[in-house]
Amino acid sequence: MELNVINTQGKAVGSLQVSDALFGREYNEALVHQVVTAFLANARSGNRAQLTRAEVKHSTKKPFRQKGTGNARAGMTSTPNRRGGGRAFPNKPDENFTQKVNRKMYRAGIATILSQLVRDERLIVVDDLSVASPKTKEFVGAVQPMGLEQALFITNELSENLYLSSRNLPNMLVIEAVQADPYSLLRFKKTVITRDAVKQLEEQWA
């Protein structure tokens, strides 16, 4: 398979022969769903927690007398059926959200996503991506000719200038090829990959 290569001005500068195993794979929706779901689940810190009725700071005083009020009897205000009381079955930090996906499936998922990006014309290959200084306006000026509103940029090596100049843009993300993940590839409208990063992705996933 052959992909067109452009420069940051949006002009064609040649083409690049790429692996069909990575960029020409058939789309498998079930596989993509499983890989993305597992990636997001494994990224969870698992630190959510609520208090039980024993852990809530409440007085153990009886809220009202046992008989004569017409209300159901009550012993304390920390019970789960009262406002401000503890949870009956609370979540605890030791909960494990890990989902196992073997390497073969994960590799196939990445290849499926990249192939679909090519078919949807959401993948752009550029010859190089660099900025002279760590300023946001430098990065915006470099990529503005390509007309990108929301994009993921993948480079073979993330320089300090490139990182610092792009980190303040909410709709742009610059990562190295080794950091590419299924969620980020699907999250952005466009994915811009440098020529060297394509080769690195092929070595890693093809």
UniProtKB/Swiss-Prot annotation:
InterPro entries: Ribosomal_uL4, Ribosomal_uL4-like, Ribosomal_uL4_dom_sf. One of its GO terms (cellular component) is ribosome. Residues 51-96 are annotated as: Disordered. Pfam families: Ribosomal_L4. One of its GO terms (biological process) is translation. Keywords: Ribonucleoprotein, Ribosomal protein, RNA-binding, rRNA-binding. Signal peptide: none annotated. One of its GO terms (molecular function) is structural constituent of ribosome. Part of the 50S ribosomal subunit. Belongs to the universal ribosomal protein uL4 family. One of the primary rRNA binding proteins, this protein initially binds near the 5'-end of the 23S rRNA. It is important during the early stages of 50S assembly. It makes multiple contacts with different domains of the 23S rRNA in the assembled 50S subunit and ribosome. This is Large ribosomal subunit protein uL4. The gene is rplD.
